[in-house]
């Protein structure tokens, strides 16, 4: 009663209440999972990991080859190099410096041991109800800053992609369901990767039904273009929709249609679109992997400047929104912007 009284000062918007009720119905109904597939996937992964660990011990002679400190020492002794780090960004450099087949093989094994192919399968087994359905997979207003739906338990909003053909996927699924590791290894090279691709197939509809999955295409780029009324971008989305190519052409004053897939300029357009649409700068480019993509440090700031110059309406929107937020805080009164 006391909680209700406190919350009464903050009434739920009329349009939000039906959404919340709908969310509750979805969570109460739950989603079916193939527990047989999940169980066998976990078992197969355990066998693969045990094999890799034995191979690592045999190759290195280490008691615990999963220990970063022990492995760094082994690489230094084997290849005669100094190893500062074995994090993801450093591995390519370590391989190049070592130039050693044994080190390459051990780093491959280490990558295999670190794969988390079955974490979501384990989560399914932990959270499934007796009827084989998982409930509570989404949380209404779960994200702290944005208020969007948040994934819970198995985190369905972040599932590995299926990259193999449907026929191969079906074959792999049948073999995993049967626990047939021997045939699986005959047909597929990367067992851990195959298990990852099968995660989506572990969610199953009721008999006679199908799951229809859809996603928004370049949703962040579309929304910011619409909010800011960046005309050239909206024209791109009205027509061919190739925003990476169009962005590169706009930024570097290239003829329309001149940038194609595989063009280095498209790569610059892509990283700029991914990192810079919402006020990001050099730090955002680095976080999105610009340096790993082959861009030089000296290219980053000019890339930021080029993108902002090509998108003046979006850049103006940022500063207008910033000024409105400051004004609202200072005056304690709402500030209306063109989009709301």
Question: Where do the protein language model's features map onto the residues?
Answer:
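Short, polar/flexible loop-turn hinges at active-site or ligand-entry regions and domain interfaces
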Residues: 6-12, 231-237, 254-259
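Short, leucine-enriched amphipathic alpha-helices that occur as contiguous helical runs
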Residues: 16-19, 263-270
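Short, amphipathic alpha-helical "recognition" segments used to contact nucleic acids or chromatin
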Residues: 268-278
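Generic long, charged, amphipathic alpha-helical segments
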Residues: 239, 243-264
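Structured ligand/cofactor/substrate-binding pocket environments in proteins
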Residues: 188-189, 210-241
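Conserved "right-hand" nucleotidyltransferase catalytic core of DNA-directed polymerases
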Residues: 1-195, 210, 217-220, 249, ...
